[in-house]
Amino acid sequence: MTKLSYEVSEDINFLDKEKSQFIKDYMTSVKFPWLYSNCSTNIGDENSMFSNVLYSDNQENKYYIPICEDLIKHISPLEIIRIKANLTTNVDTYRNVFDYHTDFENIENGLTSIYYVNTNNGGTAFENGKFVKSEQNKLVTFPMNLKHRTVPHTDNNYERIVININYIKD
């Protein structure tokens, strides 16, 4: 694990290669449904995306087990708050900037982990100035109250796919 700052840590090769490739193949196949949203983090922000809430309100959907089982085993959360898969498409330039946000507020000992399903030149930017590049099988973890945002990709990959995991560790 590499600490990028006092708040952000990065785990490269988080899962074994076979499981990482399975998740990527599964989430880019016709077996996995993506739901369109005409905004990303704030209503009216004009940043569309696709998503699928895999776990929320103590309920998992049918796609939870094949995708999340190994992730959760490695993270070992005390309590899962939400797991959400996000897909954004490539853009021509970086002018399409997503807003800084937190996924949830006022949750004591809350953490957010982002698992990068595929590699591209986008990533996640943090309000403290740190940047994490989207690289397949990387997990970045940070306090839930640290503002972050999607940095869209401009390379030839059609999609940027991440799994956001919000949880309580201790």
Feature-to-residue mapping (PLM):
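A generic structural micro-feature
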Residues: 104-109, 155-159
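Short beta-strand segments enriched in hydrophobic/aromatic residues
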Residues: 87-89, 117, 167-169
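A generic structural signal for short beta-strands and their flanking turns/coil linkers
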Residues: 79-81, 111
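Short beta-strand His + acidic residue motifs that chelate non-heme Fe in jelly-roll/DSBH
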Residues: 99-101, 147-155
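A short beta-strand-loop-beta hairpin characteristic of the jelly-roll/cupin
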Residues: 93-100, 108-110, 116-135
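Conserved metal-binding segment of the jelly-roll/cupin
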Residues: 132-149
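Non-heme Fe(II)/2-oxoglutarate
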Residues: 1-79, 91-94
